[in-house]
């Protein structure tokens, strides 16, 4: 999925932040043919998932220099998918030590301390995701949000947006129902920005609220230029 209108997307924002902080990035060869495996796993396509797992782990083992570098992913649901693969990596003597980190956690720990925020938003509506919750990344998410905005608002009725990969595209009524209450809370006022950490969730929340949601790293990149 492409970035929200006027945005650059999470990957270019992450690369910009790394360059600004003096952190080198290595992109695996053939990355356009790699996947976290969630589309196969979530639909029960076991054989396809196993094939992709073997392909991804072999590629990342080479790209990380045998596990010397962390693998950073810029979409929370994909990080969760790779984290599931990590259990297989831990059981395999061929790929010991592969480490998967969500970009929000990596930026909070290794990038944010090296940056200077030069312009803040007045207010930001923030949507944590199911995957960021499972990964334990919500503290990092809120810390970055606080760095880019004077006020951070997570709706009291926050919960799953029910976009669930392609479910929100095929059955938009699921997202409409799941987000009704939190959308009302968000739309009770106007915010300077709307952020999350996963493109499909951003699409779901954009549909629910009528406001354009973008990845939190896009806001951080803009705030530190």
Where on the chain are the PLM-derived regions?
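Iron-sulfur cluster-binding electron-transfer modules in prokaryotic oxidoreductases
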Residues: 1-225
């Amino acid at each position: 999925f492409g970035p929200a209108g006027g945005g650059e997307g999470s990957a270019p924002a992450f690369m910009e932040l790394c360059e600004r902080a003096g952190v080198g990035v290595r992109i695996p060869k053939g990355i356009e043919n790699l996947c976290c495996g969630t589309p196969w796993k979530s639909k029960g396509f076991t054989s396809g998932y196993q094939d992709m797992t073997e392909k991804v782990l072999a590629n990342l083992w080479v790209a990380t220099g045998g596990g010397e570098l962390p693998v950073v992913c810029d979409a929370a649901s994909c990080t969760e998918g790779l984290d599931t693969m990590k259990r297989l990596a831990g059981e395999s003597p061929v790929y010991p030590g592969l480490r998967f980190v969500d970009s929000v956690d990596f930026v909070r720990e290794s990038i944010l301390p090296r940056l200077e925020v030069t312009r803040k938003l007045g207010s930001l509506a923030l949507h944590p995701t199911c995957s960021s919750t499972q990964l334990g990344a919500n503290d990092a998410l809120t810390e970055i949000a606080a760095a880019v905005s004077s006020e951070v608002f997570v709706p009291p009725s926050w919960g799953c947006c029910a976009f669930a990969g392609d479910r929100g595209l095929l059955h938009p009524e699921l997202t409409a129902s799941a987000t009704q209450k939190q959308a009302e809370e968000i739309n009770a006022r106007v915010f300077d920005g709307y952020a999350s950490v996963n493109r499909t969730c951003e699409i779901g929340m954009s549909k629910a609220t009528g406001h354009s949601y973008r990845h939190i790293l896009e806001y951080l990149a803009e705030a530190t230029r």
